[in-house]
């Protein structure tokens, strides 16, 4: 099966070669359709840069990056980028810009709002909503586009516990709507990683230091023996 993403010794370097910053270094990995992958690591480890590279928002400066362009992608950020439009308008506009007729775009947007439980807020200015509601609008906007690949950069990090549970439940539903749906997300929440991921990639200083099935990543003895840096990270985050 053709990989969704295939990286070979990929690097991302900002600034001059001699004095810049290497955000990613020599990253090699393959993502298959239907995988649910968590990216973990400390702040500045390269998680966000890797997600942006996968989505095409960052360019690799070394190595090779191959994307399956036949699969539609959607990406959600920690803070949703919503326009000064109604909730419905924020969703419908994206569809219209991709060629849908305005009436069809509005109908698809309304269906997406049903899925995230925001039909009663359809005409509200999206920027007046709470953080959790805004993230649900962003999810609805992605849902309406019917992507086969969903990339998430700390999607619940800035939310209160109740909103966090709601958004995580929607992400879980989104990720399991078909066997071919691919999910790649960055998170500091190890409980969330256990609930959503089937595979975990640990990054440190722009390098992949561990790439394991989720059950092996949380196996203390295995991680401690073979991936001591990842073990220390898990131990610290769980403290």
Language model: regions and residue ranges:
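Conserved ABC ATPase "signature" region
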Residues: 103-121
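The feature captures the beta-strand-to-loop junction immediately N-terminal to the Walker
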Residues: 40-42
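H-loop/switch region of ABC-family ATPase nucleotide-binding domains
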Residues: 187-188
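Catalytic Walker B motif of ABC-type/P-loop ATPase nucleotide-binding domains
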Residues: 150-153
């Amino acid at each position: 099966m053709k990989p969704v993403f295939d990286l070979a010794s990929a690097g991302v370097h900002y600034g001059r070669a001699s004095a810049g910053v290497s955000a990613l270094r020599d990253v090699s990995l393959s993502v298959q359709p239907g995988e649910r992958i968590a990216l973990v690591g400390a702040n500045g480890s390269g998680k966000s840069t890797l997600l942006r590279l996968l989505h095409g928002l960052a360019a690799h400066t070394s190595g090779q990056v191959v994307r399956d362009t036949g699969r539609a992608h959607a990406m959600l950020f920690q803070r949703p980028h919503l326009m000064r439009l109604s909730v419905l308008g924020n969703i419908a506009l994206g569809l219209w810009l991709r060629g849908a007729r305005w009436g069809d775009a509005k109908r698809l947007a309304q269906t997406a709002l049903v899925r995230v439980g925001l039909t009663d807020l359809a005409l509200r200015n999206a920027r007046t909503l709470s953080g959790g509601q805004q993230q649900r609008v962003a999810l609805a906007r992605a849902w309406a586009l019917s992507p086969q690949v969903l990339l998430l950069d700390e999607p619940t990090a800035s939310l209160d516990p109740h909103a966090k549970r709601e958004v995580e439940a929607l992400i879980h539903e989104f990720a399991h709507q078909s066997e071919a749906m691919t999910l790649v997300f960055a998170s500091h929440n190890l409980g969330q990683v256990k609930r959503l991921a089937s595979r975990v990639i640990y990054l440190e200083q722009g390098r992949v230091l561990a790439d394991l099935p989720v059950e092996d990543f949380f196996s203390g003895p295995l991680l401690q023996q073979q991936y001591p840096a990842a073990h220390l990270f898990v131990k610290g985050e769980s403290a």
